[in-house]
From Swiss-Prot:
The active site is at 124 (s-palmitoyl cysteine intermediate). Belongs to the DHHC palmitoyltransferase family. It is found in: Membrane. Signal peptide: none annotated. It comes from Rattus norvegicus. Residues 1-18, 74-137, 188-195 are cytoplasmic. It is an enzyme of class 2 (transferase). Pfam families: DHHC. This is Probable palmitoyltransferase ZDHHC24. GO terms for biological process: protein targeting to membrane. Residues 40-52, 159-166, 217-284 are extracellular.
Length: 284
């Protein structure tokens, strides 16, 4: 018999390493951006009104990014504190031997979090937390605004990178963009030049990854699926596009993308889920 989930510790140090690396990378990006803006070529030349709009956009993006990240990390998607005992067990319920508890449909046990997650989608290793029923909305919005912030940073750093690349050959440009570490180790670039190329490379790659993740999870959102259900071709909870959006994002699903603190309560509880039959989408 394993220990009940309430008595077990949280994920160990190895599982936290991606979170540490994510935080360190974010710090490097901020330092490089500050260095280029203050001591380097500075931001692209703009008119005062355009500059004010750019600053407003940056502040808006940053607020959305940090707001959704905070909501994601503060939301507990697990069965901790959820009254499961005494509920009428129906189809889809199962017994988790690790948690020593009955768990509802669409739940899954996470070996990193060491607890079952309500409507578990996957474990986000970069943030060290599972994506489930209660934090799916901020996770999706986080992908959107992370892609926007990373692209904005790439644009702000592009004049400095362009000035560096114009002074060298095409082969040097390709090598610096694709193999900045090798260029640094062989002494072809300075540490400052390497940092600039590395940050721009990772920001562009990060934006592409966030964009791809947003497209993938947007598809799942419209289909009413989790990643686990998608991998197994299950469509048991597909209520149609409109119902699926409201089930995951609340009644204000079209507005939650623009402001992280907008009230849009979820219609469910993460324990019971409607099926197409319940909403009259299946006829005999």
């Amino acid at each position: 018999m394993g220990e009940p989930w309430a008595a077990r510790g949280t994920e160990g140090a190895p599982a936290r390493m991606p979170v540490v690396f994510t935080a360190l990378w974010a710090a490097v990006v901020v330092l490089e951006l500050t260095y280029v803006m203050v001591l380097g070529p500075g931001p692209p030349p703009l008119e005062p009104l355009a500059r004010a709009l750019q600053l407003a956009l940056a502040a808006y993006q940053l607020l959305n990014l940090l707001g959704n990240m905070g909501l994601f990390l503060r939301s507990d998607p697990s069965i901790r504190g959820v009254m499961l005992a005494g509920r009428g067990l129906g189809q889809g319920w199962a017994y988790c031997y690790q948690c020593q508890s009955q768990v509802p449909p669409r739940s899954g046990h996470c070996s990193a979090c060491r607890v079952c997650i309500l409507r578990r989608d996957h474990h986000c290793r970069l943030l060290g937390r599972c994506v489930g029923f209660h934090n799916y909305r901020p996770f999706l919005c986080l992908l959107l605004h992370a892609a926007g912030v990373l692209l904005h940073i790439s644009v702000l750093l592009s004049p400095a990178l362009s000035a560096l690349l114009q002074a060298h050959s095409a082969l040097y440009t390709v090598a610096l963009l694709l193999l900045p570490w090798l260029m640094l180790l062989t002494g072809k670039v300075s540490l400052a030049q390497f940092a600039l190329a590395f940050v721009v490379d990772t920001c562009v790659a990060g934006a592409l990854l966030c964009g791809a993740g947003l497209l993938f999870h947007g598809m799942l959102l419209l289909r009413g699926q989790t990643t686990w259900e998608w991998a197994r071709g299950q469509h048991s909870y597909d209520l149609g596009m409109s119902h699926n959006l409201q089930a995951a994002l609340g009644p204000r699903w079209a507005l939650v993308w623009f402001w992280p603190f907008l009230a849009s309560p979820l219609p469910g509880d993460g324990i019971t889920f409607q099926t197409p039959t319940d909403v009259g989408l299946v006829t005999s």
